[in-house]
Amino acid sequence: MKYFVVALALVAAFACIAESKPAESEHELAEVEEENELADLEDAVWLEHLADLSDLEEARGFFGNTWKKIKGKADKIMLKKAVKIMVKKEGISKEEAQAKVDAMSKKQIRLYVLKHYGKKALQKASEKL
């Protein structure tokens, strides 16, 4: 259960990284330079700093691809867990549970699984008290 919570925290962190705004490209910086006709030294330093952001775009692309892979695997695991939970909880066949889960959206599947494990963790905590 601890590993599951840690994995969800990592997925949330990667989601934040993937959702962040992309840095300005070098082409856009050239347009800004032409529009403003920058001659001031401070402006040149500012543009130089923004040019370094292209490296950040490459890093963001790497983390974005990694995030997509992790999210895809997490979705598959959640789908399998949802089927197992339904079979166990509702006492229906695996095929019927699979059909129900297939009809659900990814968000509904995540909520269903997290709700189940949340109740389970709460029960364990109350038993210890």
From Swiss-Prot:
Post-translational modification: Cleavage of the propeptide depends on the processing quadruplet motif (XXXR, with at least one of X being E).
Cellular component GO terms held in the UniProt record: extracellular region
Keywords, comma-separated and alphabetical: Antibiotic, Antimicrobial, Cytolysis, Hemolysis, Secreted, Signal, Toxin
Top-level taxon in the UniProt lineage: Eukaryota
Keyword Amino-acid biosynthesis: no
Proregion residues excised on maturation: 21-60
Single annotated GO MF: toxin activity
InterPro entries: Latarcin_precursor
Gene Ontology biological process: cytolysis by host of symbiont cells; defense response to Gram-negative bacterium; defense response to Gram-positive bacterium
Disulfide bonds, paired cysteine numbers: none
Tissue: Expressed by the venom gland.
Motif placement: Processing quadruplet motif: 57-60
Signal peptide region: 1-20
Subcellular location(s) of the protein: Secreted
UniProt similarity note: Belongs to the cationic peptide 06 (cytoinsectotoxin) family.
Free-text function comment from the UniProt entry: Insecticidal, cytolytic and antimicrobial peptide. Has insecticidal activity against the flesh fly S.carnaria. Has antibacterial activity against the Gram-negative bacteria E.coli. Forms voltage-dependent, ion-permeable channels in membranes. At high concentration causes cell membrane lysis.
Comment text on domains: Both the N-terminus (61-94) and the C-terminus (99-129) of the mature peptide form alpha-helices which probably disrupt target cell membranes. The linker region (95-98) probably derives from a processing quadruplet motif (PQM), found in propeptides of many zodatoxins, hinting at a fusion of two originally separate membrane-active peptides.
Protein name: M-zodatoxin-Lt8g
Underlying gene: cit 1-8
